[in-house]
């Protein structure tokens, strides 16, 4: 790979767009709408990652980028640059129904997959999860951010434990005057607030698993999204040591059930949330253990990014990247009408349609000084 200085950008039409439009022509809302409608139509079957429909989806995106006037920016095959980049992914699926239970002072409570809890297929490479009576501990937001003066773990040993955590950043629900207000930038979520970070940090801490407490406002989506996106096949990049990034158990729990769990431990969830907004917060053991038993089917599969590029005139080895993910949930649990297709107009048909329209406007302009890569990514 040649040495390249990557200048990152997003696929959203941000502050740079008015200046770009003024010099190269207007963005077409009609074209945006047409592409989004096509991508989110039933013909594309919800654009599931590595689903049988993938070749149709990525060909459509490549055709749109070609029509927009950019060049192929993908892998070289037989001496020719293509529109596609091969992406190996670890795919994992739970086999059968997971057996999950809480043991609270001798009382065993079975949890239902998708209804009470959303358990993800393991992405640590394991083909089986067997956890027996692992202790639960509430770790607030599960954040270790030394540059912000924040550490929810306080050096306590998390090995062998299931971490119960809140979604988003410690300042998301901060009230005016609280010391934490603005420490993580306010309402705009940082990476510390994302579930991906929380799983990764838990693995770094040596934890056995994670249970995220779902709340719609801090998560920014309802339980049905958690249910549909987390109880199907899961994907990750292929890692040399996936266990360093993923715990054995990764899951979400419904808030009412979490509140009961705290209550039976002599705690109030709302008060615990307030305590978690303090930099002096320390992990709180809960009076319950968790058991989990299920098989999994991990395998490495191949998916694809779609890449179009405009070479730069002055600095072709410096590349600005605009990106949006093309995949969505595919087929899942049927709705009241029996429809099983999760069409994904907003997530992320809008992003891909914006990406293609940006490519069109750039291509119609005088040509960029730096190369511009338009990347529709998988996974």
Q: Which sequence ranges carry the predicted segments?
A:
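Extracellular/luminal Protease-associated
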Residues: 112-242, 246-249, 316-321, 333, ...
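Extracellular/periplasmic catalytic domains that process cell-envelope and extracellular macromolecules
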Residues: 26-33, 91-95, 128-132, 155-159, ...
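Catalytic-core environment of secreted peptidases
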Residues: 26-73, 101-107, 157, 161-189, ...
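Long, well-ordered, tryptophan-enriched scaffold segments
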Residues: 114, 204-221, 227-229, 235-305
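Bacterial N-terminal signal peptides that target proteins for export
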Residues: 1-10
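Noncatalytic luminal/extracellular "stalk/propeptide" segments of secretory-pathway proteins
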Residues: 45-177, 284-287, 293-298, 302-303
